[in-house]
Amino acid sequence: MEQYKIWVDADACPNPIKEMLFRAAERKSVPLVLVANQMLRVPPSPYISQVRVGSGFDVADQYIVDHVEATHLVITADIPLAAHVIEKGALALNPRGELYTTDNIRQKLTMRDFMEDLRSSGVHTGGPDAFSAADKQAFANSLDKWLVRVKR
């Protein structure tokens, strides 16, 4: 069991977040694993690796769930994946810096399902706001808090 590790649901993770994670992995010597259904560009590093999974619905998510441990952090905007990660005792952080917790994950799942129902009935709900500098800063702050806690 590795004490600390960061997993990334990498297919949908914004590039500025991946770049930040690459730097953090090197700076703090924390293993970083990007999981995607396509090859990614990752810098050469003993701390950074990638896993290419087959294409298909939730294949990357399932790989992460199968390998995550309680001391790990998962970066994902996928709320059902975050729920599974939390069930396993690990932490989940979205690319906008919001930490998913046992206190907020049920509400997030309910809202996600509600919005999905609206979309399937033909209601246009719009998408998330464009990824902003404020989102990047919020993510950096949340990541730094986790890194400080685990690297004491």
UniProtKB/Swiss-Prot annotation:
Classification via Pfam families: DUF188
Family the UniProt entry places it in: Belongs to the UPF0178 family.
Record protein name field: UPF0178 protein Shewmr7_1635
Provenance organism: Shewanella sp. (strain MR-7)
